[in-house]
């Protein structure tokens, strides 16, 4: 039986009067399980990325062509990150190359597919929608290290630190951890995702946990989190 533990919580906004209380509120960290993998979440203020254990011998065989539209399995139905596998690689995981698609614009249709192929240093990700749009990128296997390709190219005024992405394998699963630090006017925050990939029932099972933290000038602090799991059917290439 596939399982995942949802950590979805109602939005919390904490208004605190003293700096000491604020530090206490922001220093909390937690541990969750994402598709049976233990994930430790450091305080977002520490700047420490979420990095899981990694062993290349534990990498799964993900080779195959899958439908871009999946079947919801469990967790938060309102989460849209996994509605389309190509868009998940592009927007949630910020995978370099996926955004280089030339016209026509990508359309999420039942005919759209995403193919994964093991190559030296990671996986090649190829997407096509059956109507002319296509893109190809590489997801590196870094054994827990940070992806250098995710830094300078993704930095801008609102995200001065760019994107920090780590990848690795554990428990027969591929994991990808992405951290986006942002600043806007008097506010700042962090968006973190941990995605777990593994073969399941002839297809591809993807589980993702999202944690979003932000702080403003009042001072106020908010946190939102969710977990969702979606299965993508394999199709003939």
Where are the regions that the model predicts?
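Sec-dependent bacterial lipoprotein signal peptides
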Residues: 1-29
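Short, intrinsically disordered low-complexity segments
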Residues: 8-14, 32, 133, 163, ...
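Amphipathic/hydrophobic helical signal segments and adjacent flexible N-terminal regions
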Residues: 29-118, 200-237
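Generic detector of low-complexity/intrinsically disordered segments
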Residues: 16, 23-24, 28, 141, ...
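Small/flexible residues
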Residues: 1, 11-17, 194, 200, ...
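Contiguous, well-ordered beta-strand patches that form the walls/edges
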Residues: 100-201, 231-237
